A protein has these predicted regions:
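Beta-strand-enriched cores of mature, soluble protein domains
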Residues: 20-153
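N-terminal signal peptide c-region/cleavage motif recognized by signal peptidases
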Residues: 14-17
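Sec-dependent signal peptide recognition
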Residues: 2-9
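Generic cytosolic/nucleocytoplasmic N-terminal low-complexity/intrinsically disordered segments
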Residues: 1-2, 41
Length: 153
């Protein structure tokens, strides 16, 4: 079971990803798992991870913080007896240094990336609703990861 949690954590680390939207707003981030829970079903296993992330923007626009803290919740599905995920989702929430908020949601892709979309935002983030990123894991460590995110649109 511990192995399933570790594999699922590492597979989904890039979900610890980003919101934003313009072609220049990419970056990298770190994720540290702060809570993990395994739910066993008859034919599969669900893993829920909650992480504390730091998103570091490559070229933040004027008025944006260079880094943003986020809390992300991942749900990862694995077939019973298998360690590789069959799919998953992530939702990240942010209240930035100036009090603006955003919510990102993402789905795991067959190429081991995560496709993220900003679904709700206020203040300076409001213009990014509908923006998408692709997150990929650069480095995995037990209990966390380092990842990159690039804008799709």
């Amino acid at each position: 079971m511990k192995k399933i949690i570790a594999i699922a954590t590492l597979a989904l680390a890039p979900t610890l990803s980003f919101a934003g939207g313009h072609a220049s707003l990419g970056g990298h981030g770190t994720a540290r798992i702060i809570d993990s829970h395994v739910i066993e079903g008859k034919s599969g296993v669900l893993v829920r991870n909650i992480s504390s992330d730091v998103w570091i923007w490559d070229n933040p626009p004027e008025g944006f913080d260079a880094a943003t803290g986020a809390e992300c919740t991942q749900y990862i599905a694995c077939a019973k007896g298998q360690e590789a995920p069959v799919g998953g989702t992530v939702t990240c929430r942010v209240i930035d240094g100036t009090g603006d908020v955003l919510i990102n949601t993402g789905t795991f892709q067959p190429n081991n990336s995560v496709l993220l979309s900003t679904i709700a935002a206020t203040g300076k983030w409001a213009a990014f609703v509908g923006a998408q990123w692709v997150g990929t894991t650069r480095h995995r460590i037990e209990g966390g990861s380092v990842y990159d995110f690039k804008p799709v649109n």
